Every structure is written in C-alpha cells, then in structure tokens.
C-alpha cells in the first residue's frame, strides 16, 4: 500500500484549525488520515468537497459528512466585552485584536470561522455570524494560489504558522526572563548569606 505524504493530505484541508474533527488541528488530522487512523468525513468546515478529495487521494470510499458547518465569522458585541483576552488567546490565527481590560474586535477578513473564541468568553459576547463566502478567511495576502479554496487555506496556514511562532517566541522570552529573575534572587540570597558569615 502506498503512503500518501502528510503535506498532500494537509493541503486539501481548509486550515481553520477548528478541532471539529477531534484532532488538535489540520496537520494532526492529516497525520491520522495518512496513518489510516481516521475516516475522511470529519472535516466539517471543508464540507463535501474536501471529503470527496480526501477519499479520492487516499483511495477510500466517500462517506457522508459526520457534521456540517455553516460558513460564519466571529463577531464580538463590543459593548459587552470586558477585555479579558480569553478570545485572543483562543484564536489560532490572531484574528482578534484588543488588550487586557479594553474592548476587543475581530478582524473579519482574517477570521477562519473556527469558533474557538466563543466557548472561553466568560460574558458570552461572541456570536458566529453566517457569511456568503464559500472559503474562509477572505484575506489572501499570504497565498500564491489562484484557486480561492486553496488561497484561503494557504493564507490561514500562514497565519497559523506565524501565530505558533509568536507564541513559541513569547514563551521562550518569558522562560528566559523567569530564569534571569530566579538567578538574580539566588545571587542576592548567596550574597546575603556570605555577608552574614562575614559579620
């Protein structure tokens, strides 16, 4: 049996990183498909088109979608937003702007419609609003594809990769700062201990 490259499978997915398939994102789902551990009908945002393409690529029978999903983008009721940043942390493509204790807003052209921002909102001020675009996000700056479906997916993938790199960089900087502070505290304690011994 021929193994299909994971990237070939991932390329067919919409790159929303929505987790509707039960996996942590599009690439983990592609890995599971490649390993024969997942059915081809789990990608709700991809719909029938993606499921048929996956079935064709993997040489599997077409299965009806396990779930369906209406194309929608997040909309924050800015008058109800308390600025908790829970939605910002949840967004896998950095499509939400705001700061702690200030009003947040969705950059609708960048929203993939994943819906991951809705559940963590403590004041229930985020709605998913149906849109007519067949492929999200509507922004396409980070794509070279002429086909709208793949252009949207490439753009979303690029945004996700940038988001992931930023988070890793922020985490590394935070750990380095904590290590510096810890080293400074230990050095101060050692100096105080030496001073007490000398006295």
What are these model-derived regions, one by one?
Residues 110, 116-199:
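Flanking helices and flexible, charged tails adjoining ferredoxin-like Fe-S electron-transfer domains
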Residues 1-4:
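A short, flexible low-complexity segment enriched in Lys/Arg and Gly/Pro that occurs
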Residues 6-15, 37-45, 62-83, 88-89, ...:
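Ferredoxin-like iron-sulfur electron-transfer modules
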Residues 28-37:
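Amphipathic alpha-helical segments that form the core helices of the histone-fold
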